[in-house]
Design a protein with these regions (language model features):
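Edge beta-strand at a domain terminus
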Residues: 85-105, 154-179
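Bacterial N-terminal signal peptides
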Residues: 11-21
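N-terminal helix-cap/turn-to-beta initiation motif at the start of protein domains
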Residues: 25-31, 110-115
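A short, surface-exposed beta-strand/turn
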Residues: 131-154
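N-terminal segment immediately downstream of the Sec signal-peptide cleavage site
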Residues: 26-77, 163-179
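Predominantly extracellular/secreted and cell-surface proteins with exposed
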Residues: 49-136
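Bacterial N-terminal signal peptides that target proteins for export
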Residues: 2-12
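Short acidic, glycine-rich loop/turn motifs
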Residues: 40-44, 122-130, 159
Length: 179
């Protein structure tokens, strides 16, 4: 009987700790800021996958259930494309390099297993001008584990953004959490 109680406690305590940390984050009236890096590849295309890299930041707006998100992303055809499709020529001009600024204002914050998500409509630029894929639905999922409560981020674009970034989540890392 004691071993069943111990096993039950061993299973429930980590869940309660994670729920408590998320609850404390959600109930704190101060704004919480998270930031990190996206480091991903788009799905395979006829020209090859794109490398997608850049910094992001997210601000949880206290108890409002809202958040603001921004990312500055660089995209270029991958090294794999250079080796298989471009005869090993690493000329940056041939790699289709471009930038995107992604902004989501007043996104809705909801709890998910192991963290939270922010969803809403994002504005997207390409090389500083409006992108034809803007506006697009965007879901940002921030998760973690028992040692690091918020360690991972994943960005998933809806159409028309998914036509450019792909339908799979773009992974990244949480580097900093500030309260």
């Amino acid at each position: 009987m004691k071993s069943k109680a111990f096993l039950w406690a061993a299973r429930i305590i980590p869940v309660l700790m994670l729920a408590g940390s998320i609850s404390a984050l959600a109930q704190d009236s101060r704004h919480t800021k998270l930031s990190g890096l996206v480091n991903a590849y788009s799905p395979q295309t006829t020209t090859g996958p794109y490398e997608i890299r850049g910094p992001w930041s997210l601000e949880l707006k206290g108890r409002s259930g809202k958040a603001n998100f921004s990312a500055a992303l660089n995209m270029e055809l991958s090294d794999g494309w250079v080796l298989t499709k471009n005869n090993g020529d690493f000329d940056p001009n041939a790699r289709g390099a471009h930038t995107h600024h992604v902004t989501l204002v007043n996104g809705d914050v909801t709890l998910v297993s192991g963290g939270f998500q922010v969803s809403g409509t994002a504005t997207i630029t390409v090389n500083g001008s409006p992108a034809p894929i803007s506006p697009s639905p965007l879901v940002i999922v921030v998760t973690g584990g028992t040692d690091v409560a918020f360690s991972n981020v994943a960005l998933t674009f809806g159409s028309p953004g998914s036509n450019h970034f792909g339908t799979e989540a773009l992974p990244g890392v949480v580097r900093r959490v500030e309260k």
